[in-house]
Design a protein with these regions (language model features):
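A short acidic, often aromatic-flanked loop/helix-cap motif at beta-alpha or helix-coil junctions
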Residues: 1, 22-27, 45, 65, ...
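Glycine-rich P-loop/Walker A and Walker A-like loops and their local beta1-loop-alpha1 context
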Residues: 1-27, 32
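Anionic group-transfer/hydrolysis microenvironments
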Residues: 20, 73-74, 105
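Conserved nucleotide-sensing/catalytic segment adjacent to the nucleotide-binding pocket
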Residues: 27-96
Length: 149
């Protein structure tokens, strides 16, 4: 069982926002509506992922931006750092999501590249801040979940 499947086993009503998609990060940062172009042919899958028959996912109004779970935070941090922005600026934007899925970077290996080290460190600092605020923390590794908090 992966991290998202584990989260869905705990909460049935999750609606995930992928922050690895630059458009999604931009929309979150700017409080814009969610717009994403995806090529999917299966209509049932389209319904589950808010896709219209034209293969567009969209939410027309700001108040409809009601995602309650977020993932690929590490990619959003990288995107922000590449643009010279502060990674911790994400904290206030995502701390109130019901589920926040974090990915480990480097498995404890310190990268040689300066930017890669900074990405790893700032992502870790953001994760620490999120864990301090969290009511519950679980680590899912190789399909097994371990409750940490």
């Amino acid at each position: 069982m992966g991290k998202r499947a584990f989260a869905q086993s705990l909460y049935k009503d999750l609606k995930f926002l992928d922050l690895g998609e630059p458009d999604n990060l931009e929309n979150l940062l700017n409080n814009f509506a969610y717009i994403k172009n995806i090529k999917i042919k299966d209509e049932e899958l389209c319904k589950k992922n808010l896709l219209s028959k034209n293969n567009f996912a969209y939410v027309k109004e700001e108040e409809d931006f009601n995602f309650n779970a977020v993932f690929n935070i590490h990619l959003a941090v990288r995107n922000l750092l590449e643009r010279g922005q502060d990674a911790l600026s994400l904290f206030n934007l995502i701390k109130n999501f019901k589920v926040i899925i974090c990915d480990e970077i480097g498995a404890g290996v310190v990268p040689l590249d300066k930017f890669e080290r900074r990405w790893r460190d700032e992502t870790g600092l953001l994760y620490q801040a999120l864990v301090r605020e969290a009511d519950r923390v679980d680590r899912v590794w190789a399909g097994l979940a371990l409750r940490l908090k």
